[in-house]
Amino acid sequence: MEQGTNSRGRPGRPKANLEIDLYSTPAGARAVENPVRRTILAALRERECTFEEIVSLAGRAKSTVSVHLQDLAAAGVIGSRPDPEDSRRKIFFLTGDLVASVLPETRVADDLAAYAGMYRPGSGDPFAFYRLAFRTIRVSLMQEGVLLDPLLTRAGEWLGEELYPAVAAPETGAFCANIARFWEEHRLGRIEVAETEPLVLLIYDCFECVDLPVTGKPACAFDSGILRALFSRHYGRPAEAVETRCYSMGFDHCRFEIAVEGGGREECRTPE
């Protein structure tokens, strides 16, 4: 759809001040730079919308919004269907997912080595290199202002689904203990249950963020996805792992509150 140019005017690396959202579609990845289109897609990520609702949210003339919708549809980012209450109207929806965003204000200007660290052969830790590789990729993207949180969350959810049988337990306390044991055995961090009503987990030495720059924002999208999938399976209904503290926010641990659909924060109890 839209492509950045480098300082010499050739297609390539985005301009330093360019904000871009990257969407996956059935036809491949699509980059969206135009702020009006980004606003439209942000609204559609929340829910499906009618044309009139999109016009109101975008704050642009109907003719302008219509052109943007046509281009987004042609790129395969959105689709539409007739409104069941009025066949003359259309309801618009996303056909893909937000994969990443390039946001100049989130660029990390510090030296990569300060956060990526060094690999020391013979350290005796078989997981050290893989943690280093994950951290280096993450910080390299942060230096460019690229946020992969949506993609990392979905990857975490997939992994959580695969992991669930290995940690499943009918009682919530035992379930949390199994998760903590798995985290420690695989050098992912140390998990403690800080509160039971609601259920709050603390993660120390978190593999995902312990060495990341302090940005003031949560950084554990991958962990959030894993925990979301695990507790959704455990409680038998959609759950969220809401990160309220993180190493990247200046804390010495990460803190997750487990929120379950229809019940707010979930208590640590045996599910009925």
Put a short name on every predicted segment:
Residues 218-236:
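Active-site helix/loop of acyl-thioester processing domains in fatty-acid/polyketide metabolism
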